[in-house]
């Protein structure tokens, strides 16, 4: 656990409390598009030691919607100015956890898709299509396995 170097102001504390980890705007945007296109999924379902934002368990597909700041996109461009040691440790640990979760799921045969928040906002249709393409690939593999058994 990382300890803050300086006391947190009441305003900062309130700002941090207002940030949600579930049902974020980017998750809702992607989920709406998937639902609109007929994809049915589970939300925040525990799978192994992970909790993907979206999962299609029938085809072992796990989707993570990673906020750009919290998960380290372009982190080393120097956006953080205050309390740098705290944020460096926090963001680095988030990135390590993302990597560990991806490896864990892949080792168990899951397809893991990760989308940056900016990627979802920019082109949610393309993000949804990548998920649908993964589902369709898994469907073909299942059909092939079934026909080989006959």
Region spans (language model):
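Nucleic-acid endo/exonuclease domains
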Residues: 1-114, 118-150
């Amino acid at each position: 656990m990382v300890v803050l170097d300086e006391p947190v102001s009441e305003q900062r504390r309130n700002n941090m409390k207002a940030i949600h980890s579930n049902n974020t705007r980017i998750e809702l945007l992607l989920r709406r598009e998937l639902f609109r296109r007929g994809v049915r999924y589970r939300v925040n379902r525990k799978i192994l030691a992970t909790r993907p934002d979206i999962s299609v368990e029938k085809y072992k597909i796990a989707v993570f919607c990673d906020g750009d700041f919290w998960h380290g996109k372009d982190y080393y461009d120097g956006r953080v100015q205050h309390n740098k040691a705290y944020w460096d440790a926090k963001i680095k640990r988030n990135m390590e956890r993302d990597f560990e979760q991806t490896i864990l799921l892949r080792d168990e045969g899951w397809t893991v898709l990760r989308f940056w928040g900016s990627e979802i906002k920019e082109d949610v249709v393309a993000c949804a299509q990548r998920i649908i393409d993964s589902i369709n690939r898994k469907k073909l593999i299942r059909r092939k396995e079934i026909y080989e058994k006959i």
